[in-house]
Amino acid sequence: MNDLLNKKCVPCEGGVLPFDISEIHKYQKKVDGWDIIKNEKKIFYLYKKYEFKNFLESQIFINKVGDISENEGHHPDISFGWGYAEIKITTHAIEGLSENDFILAAKIDQIINV
């Protein structure tokens, strides 16, 4: 079992450094299928696209993601439509990735694996 599933996101108000690239790659191994992307501001994100059979399945999934995000106090950027949902996760307060991002990614994946 992924040890990230037993952790809870902790509030981040800044003041800590984002993960460096070696930490990012270490944690990336714990979340299957999540890509590391860098936006135009050079901020790292976790990214994953999920595919579904129709709009309703996408919507149900996104609602579950919303519930988990509220419970964890950590909120991804979400876009979805007919048959897909795209999720980007970063820790905005530190403009980069932290353990919280990987915890949330692991918990989101559990929705699909249940």
Named regions from a protein language model:
Residues 1-56, 60-114:
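Long, contiguous binding/interaction regions
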